[in-house]
Every structure is written in structure tokens, then in C-alpha cells.
A protein has these predicted regions:
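Phosphopantetheine-dependent thiolation modules in NRPS/PKS and related acyl-activating systems
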Residues: 1-39, 43-90
Length: 90
């Protein structure tokens, strides 16, 4: 896996899910909730906090897009990448 954002997102999600709920094969299309890592709402919140610690404040103003962003490891990585590129540097 060459995408550093996706690689870090997967590391974070694996840490939150733990080894018992980490699928044998994990990639961009792996679901964060049912059928994938089986994360509940509190664990998804942990993922959000860990991603904010790793990448900065990328979830502010997410609103109705939250369900789409938190669907798969890839959708989360894509949203983080888009929001970190859009943030002013300084």
C-alpha cells in the first residue's frame, strides 16, 4: 500500500477495532462498521479523534457527509486527504 494517508487510517482503525474484529484482508473498500471492522458509534468517534490527532482538524463542518465519509477505510482516507490539501498552510 503506497498511500500514506490510507495506510495511517487503516492503522488507526485496526487499533480501535482490535485483532478480534480486524478482517483478514483490509483495504480501501473495507467497511468501518457492519461487515468490516464492526465499529459501533463510540468506536467511530474514537477513530475520528485519533484521525484528528494524526492529521489535524479535518472533521469540522462535516455534517451530513459524516455517514459517507465513515463508510469505508478508503472513503475516510479520501476525505482526510481532500480536507488536509484544502487547509491553508501556515
Amino acid at each position: 500500500m503506497t498511500d500514506p494517508v490510507l495506510r495511517r487510517v487503516i492503522e488507526i482503525v485496526k487499533q480501535v477495532a482490535g485483532p478480534q474484529r480486524t478482517p483478514a484482508v483490509v483495504g480501501p473498500s473495507t467497511l468501518l462498521a457492519g461487515g468490516g471492522f464492526w465499529l459501533d458509534s463510540m468506536e467511530l468517534f474514537e477513530v475520528i479523534l485519533a484521525c484528528e490527532a494524526a492529521f489535524g482538524s479535518v472533521f469540522r463542518g462535516l455534517g451530513e457527509d459524516a455517514a459517507r465519509v465513515l463508510h469505508t477505510a478508503g472513503s475516510l482516507a479520501t476525505a482526510i486527504r481532500a480536507r488536509t490539501q484544502a487547509q491553508p498552510r501556515g
